[in-house]
Amino acid sequence: FDFILIEGAGGIAVPIYEGTDDFYMTKDLINDCADCVISVLPSKLGAISDAIVHQDYVNQNVSASNFLIMNRYTDSYIEKDNQMTIGKLTNKTVYTFEEHATYENFSEAFLKQLIGVKNELHTTT
């Protein structure tokens, strides 16, 4: 990747700048320059609702593809159930990232998905 933008401003539906007539939102920045989005989800109670609302917003407003990853995953029964349920409801693979893990702990499957990701919107011919 030439550039990596890490969003930490409170979510994908957050205004970055208020113009005269409208807002420039995080989704606008993503649409302007992102090839893919890694959507970081909670793994605890409430994760299903957060994931469904987030993914619905992404599907309606973002042109880049996205990956779902549950953060601070401890492999508890609730987290396993959340992962399975979110996957079924979004029709997406839900990757996990363990609590206190480092970049070396990303799964091979997740890293393979990232390699070569290209958003057709930003590809010129």
Q: What are the functions of these language-model segments?
A:
Residues A9-G10, K44, Y73:
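Anionic group-transfer/hydrolysis microenvironments
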Residues D2-F3, A34-D35, N66:
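Conserved acidic residues
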Residues I52, D56-T125:
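C-terminal lobe/tail of nucleotide-utilizing enzymes
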Residues L5-E7, I38-V40, I69:
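Structural motif
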Residues V14, G46-D50, I78:
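Secondary-structure boundary/capping motif
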Residues F1-D21:
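Switch II (G3) loop of P-loop NTPases
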Residues G19-S43:
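Inter-motif core of Ras-like GTPase G domains
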Residues F23-I30, S49-N59:
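Histidine-anchored nucleotide/phosphate-binding helix
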